[in-house]
Amino acid sequence: MRRIDSCFAELRANGRKALIPFITAGDPSLEATVPVMHALVRAGADVIELGVPFSDPMADGPTIQRSSERALARGAGLAYVLEAVHEFRREDATTPVVLMGYLNPIEIHGTRRFAEAAVAAGVDGVLLVDLPPEEAGETRTIFTEVGLALIALASPTTSEQRLDMLCSTAQGYLYYVSFAGVTGASNLLDTHAASDRLRQLRRRAGAPVVAGFGIKDAASAAAMAVDADGVVVGSALVAALAEVNDVRSARERAEAFLAPLRQALDQG
């Protein structure tokens, strides 16, 4: 959790926006995950969101669903994900890593056992798509005790009552879903409507607010970052990585994809 807080504090002090790429652990291959993570950092990533493959990713569109299926077929379970983070930490002790996934694998593992193992591996935060904030108290308590941030999601359809809860309990950063739907589903991103909501959230939240869903390239990243503390890019990056087979190509594709987004954010 401290790495996330330090990262955003440094970005704020330098007037910069966070660039947060999402990749699925184990895709395009088990061997490529850690090299791609390092490549993303070289290209300007501030935080890395690492997707935990799950058999029923209900909030994800076809691109990430297929990515998750491929990773699971290769054996990329929770143990693999934690080992990948541990390996990443051998060379990178500063870049925050956030796991993004679903509640079921963690409940099977045991919440406290998972939290302790995640921190030991070098994980800084966890975003659980299907954990309602009203039911997150016990999980948040366990995570806080071990130093793990429970990242919350807000969307255009989130009620005011729930927003109050999310803003008051936000840890690490608050992830604002810029439109209602599944990941990668929209070709049209309404930046004006999202910007209004982002400004409201930043006034209310006790943590940085980042925007995701629908960000596909440098232009959409720069537009969304104007009123956010950072942006998340997922499906477009996952789709780009799905086109390559070997580790070297995956590294090169990751850097080539992310570098223009970093440049756009820094120039904006």
From Swiss-Prot:
Q: Which organism is it from?
A: Xanthomonas axonopodis pv. citri (strain 306)
GO molecular function terms attached to this record: tryptophan synthase activity
Q: Which UniProt keywords apply?
A: Amino-acid biosynthesis, Aromatic amino acid biosynthesis, Lyase, Tryptophan biosynthesis
Write the Enzyme Commission number(s) for this entry.
4.2.1.20
Quaternary structure annotation from Swiss-Prot or TrEMBL: Tetramer of two alpha and two beta chains.
The coding gene here is trpA
**Pfam families associated with the record:** Trp_syntA
Could you tell me what this protein is called?
A: Tryptophan synthase alpha chain
Q: Output the HAMAP family linked to this UniProt entry.
A: Trp_synth_alpha (MF_00131)
Q: Which family does it belong to?
A: Belongs to the TrpA family.
